[in-house]
Amino acid sequence: GIQVDEVLTIRDVDAKFGHVVFSGSIIISGNVCEGMHVSAGGCLTVAGLVESARLEVGGDLLVEKGIIGHPLNEQGGYSCTVHCTGAVAARFVQYADISAGGDITIASQSLHSRIQTPGSLTVADASRSKGSLVGGVSVVGQQILAVTIGAVADSSTQLVISGRYPELLAHRKEVRAQIEQSEIAIHQLDDAEAKVHQMPIGDKRQQLSHKIAATRSYLQYNLTSQQQEWETTNAERDAFLAQARILCARHLFPGVKVEIAGLKLVSDREYQTCQIHHQDGALVIEPLTALPPDNSSTHKPG
């Protein structure tokens, strides 16, 4: 049969209306006001502003206008927090803490915010002509695309792409150790086999030879599996490094701190259309010849 999700429609979420907790999807035609809490089990759409509020979303979040907060303390806390299982799309974000399970798309600007996603972050409109990423810390798993990154006389913009890289490195180390153990065991078996060949021909020698052959077959099977896992892990690492890029459509300002897969770089001057990526064990800033297409939803705020 057809499954119909429950949808709750509200005008404004303010002190008069109260906090909202709903298991289905929520459409708010107005604003989510200061100090309010909205929890949606499904998707959440806000036609207006989200101002110093707390949002928890089980699906995707769309904010037609902006998500705005203010700093709470010197430790970096913000008055506006968003935790979303799916993707997040908003026109602008300022002094907010946003974590999403899917991609995060901000149409015009992200200012002094903390952004986290295992996916990609895009700060750009559909035409890639505006979109400023200034200040704050953005930690993503795949790629960052913005029109302008950093600002004149600003050195507080931090961009980190880590994703699965630490996990892949740890697994690679583990597989390498397993391969070495298997190779040592096979070498020890060679020594044992040489000693058996020196024994007088008889039942005992034959028994030991059969046992060694069975053990060799088992060890060789393990070693082959481990070598295949090594190749797979290396391919996954290479694929991650190939797509872990920061793409800047117009201006990258000096003082932007970048970390990709554990390697660090600080932009030393202003760059025009460029990309930052991993190359031969270092991060490099190179000209960007083509931007990826805009594959985001047509519902993205413009």
Residue ranges and their predicted role:
Residues G1-P118, T122-V123, S132-V137, G141, ...:
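Charge-rich, low-hydrophobicity low-complexity segments
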